[in-house]
A protein has these predicted regions:
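Gly/Thr-rich phosphate-binding loop signature of adenosyl cofactor/nucleotide-binding cores
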Residues: 1-62
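Catalytic-site beta-strand/loop segments enriched in glycine and acidic/polar residues
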Residues: 36-37, 58-73, 118-137
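Fold-independent oxyanion-binding glycine-rich loops
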Residues: 39-41, 73-74, 96, 127, ...
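Hydrophobic/aromatic ligand-binding patch that stacks against planar heteroaromatic rings
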Residues: 60, 84, 145-146
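Residue-level detector of anion-binding/catalytic polar loops
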Residues: 67, 91, 152
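Extreme N-terminal, non-catalytic leader segments
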Residues: 70-73, 78-127
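Glycine-rich phosphate-binding P-loop
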Residues: 127-154
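Conserved nucleotide-sensing/catalytic segment adjacent to the nucleotide-binding pocket
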Residues: 152-198
C-alpha cells in the first residue's frame, strides 16, 4: 500500500497477532494495537469464504486501527486488502519468510526496539562494566586502560541502556559517539582505528 503515509503509523506493542479468530468473527479481547500476521492458516480460511464475508471481517480489523498487516510465505494479498488498507491508512506488507520464523524475528526485533530505555552519563566497557561518576574524574582514562588490556569499548560519555526483559539490560552508544573516546589533554580518539574491533 504505497499510498499509506507510514510516518503516521505508531507501533507501541511488542506482541504480534495472527487474526484467525477475527476472520472467524470473534472480536472479544482483540488487541488492535498489535501487528497482524497472515500465514497459510488464515489465508486458506479466507479462501473458503466469499468476497462479501472477507470484506466485512477485514474491514472490522482495519477499522479497529491496526498498525499494519503482513502476509508471510510469499502469499499475495487480494486487491481488497490493498483497497481497505488505503481507505483506513493501514500498511499491507508481504514477506517470503515462513510465518513462524518471521513471527519470532519480528517479536524479538520489537522487544529490543520498543524496550524501555534511559541515557546516563558514564563509560561502558564490554560485559557490563559501567563506570559512572562526576565529570572530569577520569572515567574515559580508566576505560582506555581496560581497552588496552583487551576489553571492548561500548560507549563513552553517554550510554543508552535498554531493558529488553526482566533480567537483561543492553547498553549501546549513540551513533554520533560510537567508537570514539574523549581524553582530557589529548582530545577525541578513534578507539576502533587504534585498537581494532573484536
Amino acid at each position: 500500500t504505497p499510498e499509506v503515509d507510514t510516518k503516521k503509523i505508531v507501533i507501541r506493542q511488542t506482541d504480534v497477532n495472527r487474526p484467525a479468530l477475527q476472520f472467524a468473527g470473534y472480536f472479544e479481547y482483540f488487541d488492535y494495537s498489535r501487528i497482524q500476521l497472515i500465514g497459510k492458516v488464515e489465508y486458506s480460511y479466507l479462501k473458503m469464504h466469499d468476497d462479501d464475508y472477507i470484506r466485512e471481517m477485514t474491514e472490522k480489523i482495519f477499522k479497529a486501527g491496526i498498525p499494519c498487516m503482513i502476509f508471510c510465505r510469499g502469499l499475495e494479498p487480494r486487491p481488497l486488502f490493498m483497497e481497505l488498507g488505503n481507505k483506513y491508512g493501514v500498511s499491507v506488507l508481504a514477506t517470503d519468510d515462513g510465518t513462524s520464523s518471521f513471527f519470532s524475528e519480528l517479536n524479538r526485533f520489537l522487544k529490543i526496539e520498543l524496550a524501555p530505555r534511559i541515557s546516563i552519563h558514564g563509560v561502558l566497557v564490554d560485559e557490563g562494566v559501567l563506570i559512572t561518576g562526576e565529570s572530569g574524574i577520569g572515567k574515559s582514562e580508566a576505560a582506555l586502560e581496560l581497552v588496552k588490556r583487551g576489553h571492548r569499548l561500548v560507549s563513552d560519555d553517554v550510554v543508552e541502556i535498554k531493558k529488553t526483559n526482566n533480567d537483561e539490560l543492553i547498553g549501546t552508544a549513540p551513533d554520533i559517539t560510537r567508537y570514539f573516546i574523549e581524553l582530557r589533554g589529548i582530545g577525541i580518539i578513534d578507539v576502533k582505528t587504534l585498537y581494532g574491533v573484536q
